[in-house]
From Swiss-Prot:
Primary gene name: msrA
Keyword set, alphabetical order: Oxidoreductase
Entries under SUPFAM superfamilies matching the protein: Peptide methionine sulfoxide reductase (SSF55068)
Metal-binding listed as a keyword: no
The keyword Transcription regulation appears for this protein: no
Principal EC category: oxidoreductase
EC number: 1.8.4.11
Summary of the function given for this chain in its UniProt record: Has an important function as a repair enzyme for proteins that have been inactivated by oxidation. Catalyzes the reversible oxidation-reduction of methionine sulfoxide in proteins to methionine.
Protein name: Peptide methionine sulfoxide reductase MsrA
GO biological process per UniProt: protein modification process
Length: 169
């Protein structure tokens, strides 16, 4: 099994697309990249811990390749916005691909270069690619949020879905 970590705005909106793929064993919401061990949602939202909201994905590389996960990641984000994603603003919502191996780093960097060269976006691709840091599991009520709160999920992801439809379909 392998592990992937992606930050692309609110973690509520990042889980479902990955959970729907064959070969995904788990998708967990949490926090990474900061300086405070085991931060709470409130601490991360206060923007004082340095963490980003992210999803940790455990996958079977025999069933789904990391490259495919990176491609799916791009299609969930606005890779030209370094200051958050959609209605979620600030460093805690910035887009980051966290790599857990040097091979993941190579794949992510090549994928980013390919996306930039594709001309899909007029602006530069600013998503960062950084080494994975400790991943702290978010509170239970954040896990599988889209399943537990479908109406609230739909409301909170409307702007994201419009962008994705216009730019990735």
């Amino acid at each position: 099994m392998e592990r992937a970590i992606f930050a692309g705005g609110c973690f509520w909106c990042m889980g479902q697309p990955f959970e729907e793929q064959a070969g995904i064993l788990s998708v967990r919401s949490g926090y990474t990249g900061g300086h405070l061990p085991n931060p709470s949602y409130e601490q991360v939202c206060a923007k004082t811990t340095g963490h980003t909201e992210a999803v940790e994905i455990i996958f079977d590389p025999k069933q789904i390749a990391y490259k495919d996960l990176v491609e799916l990641y791009w299609a969930q984000t606005d890779p030209t916005d370094a200051f958050g994603q959609f209605e979620d603003r600030g460093d805690n919502y910035r887009p980051v691909i966290y790599y857990t191996t040097e091979r993941q780093k190579e794949i992510a960097e090549q994928s980013k270069a390919n996306l930039q060269a594709s001309g899909r976006f007029d602006q530069p691709i600013v998503t960062t690619i950084e080494p994975a840091e400790p991943f702290y599991l978010a509170e239970d009520y954040h896990q599988g949020f889209y399943k537990k709160n479908p109406k609230r999920y739909a409301q909170s992801s409307a702007i994201r879905h419009q962008f994705l439809e216009e730019n990735w379909s």
